[in-house]
């Protein structure tokens, strides 16, 4: 245990907390510091130049990461008729309507993401107190309330991540695993940042991407030079 601690400490000394790294170097450092016995997630925190107290500056949406997330996602779909069949054909793990709502009320929540057709929201809306705290409530802003359930399910399975600013105006997301290549992580990071830039509120003034930091589950944070992300 002592040897492991010394090794981790040695790796962490490689990270200069006062330096902002080019994205390729930052990703290499984060991967090098991911020494846990499990495949650590690679996480990003983006501090945006918004006023998080104002509703018109809330940044929320979703993006499909080109290299995936490295995680298997169980998808539930609230739909009926042809849309239910389309959801099953697209690979949804759980499909139902009022019967699925009863399962949720009974505490049987065996899924990681929830999609609903607009007409199903009269049923799903009654589950707000159950799904909301778990981050599972469908929302049109992230593409989980839609008539196009086929695309929604396929995107979820392909590696779609949702993002939303917290009270401090920071976006937290996972862009992959330590086992991913630097190139794959860079592709995912670029896709997420592109999505954030496109979602910039009109009322946001000044520098938008104020600070970007990467870390693994158990590793140190590494600051990234924002201008290097899409230029690399």
From Swiss-Prot:
CC terms in the record's Gene Ontology section: cytosolic large ribosomal subunit
Name this polypeptide is given: Large ribosomal subunit protein uL1
PROSITE patterns assigned: RIBOSOMAL_L1
Family of this protein: Belongs to the universal ribosomal protein uL1 family.
Organism of provenance: Aromatoleum aromaticum (strain DSM 19018 / LMG 30748 / EbN1) (Azoarcus sp. (strain EbN1))
Biological process annotations from GO: regulation of translation; translation
Keywords (A to Z) from UniProt: Repressor, Ribonucleoprotein, Ribosomal protein, RNA-binding, rRNA-binding, Translation regulation, tRNA-binding
InterPro entries recorded: Ribosom_uL1_bac-type, Ribosomal_uL1, Ribosomal_uL1-like, Ribosomal_uL1/biogenesis, Ribosomal_uL1_3-a/b-sand, Ribosomal_uL1_CS
Function field: Binds directly to 23S rRNA. The L1 stalk is quite mobile in the ribosome, and is involved in E site tRNA release. Protein L1 is also a translational repressor protein, it controls the translation of the L11 operon by binding to its mRNA.
PANTHER family assigned to the protein according to its UniProt record, in alphabetical order: 54S RIBOSOMAL PROTEIN L1, MITOCHONDRIAL, LARGE RIBOSOMAL SUBUNIT PROTEIN UL1M
Quaternary context: Part of the 50S ribosomal subunit.
NCBIfam families in UniProt: rplA_bact
Transmembrane feature ranges: none
Record keyword Ligase present: no
GO molecular function: rRNA binding; structural constituent of ribosome; tRNA binding
CDD domains (UniProt xref): Ribosomal_L1
């Amino acid at each position: 245990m002592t040897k492991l601690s010394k090794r981790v400490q040695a790796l962490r000394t490689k990270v200069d907390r006062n330096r902002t790294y080019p994205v390729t170097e930052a990703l290499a450092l984060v991967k090098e510091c991911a020494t846990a016995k499990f495949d650590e997630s690679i996480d990003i925190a983006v501090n945006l130049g918004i006023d998080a107290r104002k509703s018109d500056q809330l940044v929320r949406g979703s993006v499909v990461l080109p290299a995936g997330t490295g995680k298997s996602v169980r998808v539930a779909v609230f739909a009926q008729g042809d849309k239910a069949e389309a959801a099953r054909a697209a690979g949804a793990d759980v499909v139902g309507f009022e019967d699925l709502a009863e399962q949720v009320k009974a505490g049987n929540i065996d899924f990681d993401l929830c999609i609903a057709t607009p007409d199903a929201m009269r049923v799903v809306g009654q589950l707000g107190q159950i799904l909301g705290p778990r981050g599972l409530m469908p929302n049109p802003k992230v593409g989980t309330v839609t008539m196009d359930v086929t695309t929604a399910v396929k995107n979820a399975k392909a590696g779609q991540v949702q993002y939303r600013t917290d009270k401090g105006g920071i976006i937290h997301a996972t862009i992959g695993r330590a086992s991913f290549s630097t190139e794959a992580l860079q592709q995912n990071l670029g896709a997420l940042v592109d999505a954030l830039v496109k979602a910039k509120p009109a009322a946001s003034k000044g520098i938008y991407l104020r600070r970007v930091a990467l870390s693994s589950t158990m590793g140190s944070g590494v600051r990234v030079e924002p201008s290097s992300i899409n230029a690399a």
